[in-house]
Structures are given as C-alpha cells and as structure tokens.
C-alpha cells in the first residue's frame, strides 16, 4: 500500500522532488497513513527522521542512516534479529563509507541472504514462526530492501 501511494503521488506530480527534506517528510506522512501495522509507523519514522537530517544539512546517506537509527530505537530491531535491518544497515553503512550504489546493493543482498540462515527471528512478523518455516527463506522485509537497492543500480 505504501509503495502504491508514493507511486500514485509521483505519477500525479504531487511530490516535491526538488526539495528532499520536504519529499522525505511527505513520504513519511503518507506511509504512516496508508501502511498497516507497525511497518507503516516504522517506515514513517525512518523517512521523517531522514528528512529532518536533510533539512539540517546532512547528506542523503547520513540522513538515511539517521532514519534507520531512529527506526531501530523505536522498533527495537537490530542486526541479527531477522528483519529488514539486516539488509538496510549494511547497505547504508556502505553508502556512508563512500562506496558505490552497486556496492550498497551487494551489501543489502548479502544482508538479506544472511536472514535465510538465521535460526530464529527476534522481531517482526517472522518472530511468530517456527524454525522449520524460516529455514532457507529470506526475511520478507530484508528481501524488499534488497530489491529496492537492486532496482536503483
């Protein structure tokens, strides 16, 4: 629902593409209103915090990293918990270290792949599933992050 809402706003030319802080704030607001469950709130936190960092003069990688830190703070997920954090954090670490978008995409893919080997999930919807169900399957949120970064390359 969130991606469709943003895509619809983009197609209707309702997004302030030339003003990244405003864009991120608007995306955060829209995600909070259309995405269900905790995912919408957490993605809203990420984009809103990133927008604030951009407004204060931060670079895009720094802003996204700040958004991730806020999301982790409020959501509680960390690397190794089998969530989108396992793919997003390594990708953003690569970008903040000055690596290329392709290298960030590789980091996201490796992070997503690592979730398929995790014995249990400590956060997110996957935490309700048993080991047999999780074995060999990437976390859906981590996989989504992997696909987003792959599409950007």
Where are these regions (language model features)?
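N-terminal loops that bind phosphate or other acidic moieties
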Residues: 1-153
């Amino acid at each position: 629902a969130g991606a469709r809402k943003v895509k619809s706003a983009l197609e209707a030319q309702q997004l302030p593409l030339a003003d990244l802080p405003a864009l991120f704030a608007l995306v955060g607001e829209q995600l909070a209103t259309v995405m269900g469950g905790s995912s919408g709130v957490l993605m809203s936190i990420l984009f809103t915090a990133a927008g604030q960092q951009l407004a204060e003069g931060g670079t895009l990688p720094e802003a996204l990293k700040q958004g991730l830190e806020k999301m982790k703070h409020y959501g509680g997920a960390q690397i190794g918990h089998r969530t989108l954090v396992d793919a997003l954090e390594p990708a953003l670490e690569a970008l903040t270290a000055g690596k290329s978008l392709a290298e960030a995409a590789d980091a996201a893919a490796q992070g997503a792949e690592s979730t398929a080997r995790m014995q249990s999930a400590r956060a997110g919807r996957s935490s309700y599933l048993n080991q047999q169900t999780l074995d060999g399957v990437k976390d859906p949120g981590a996989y989504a992050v992997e696909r987003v970064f792959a599409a950007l390359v």
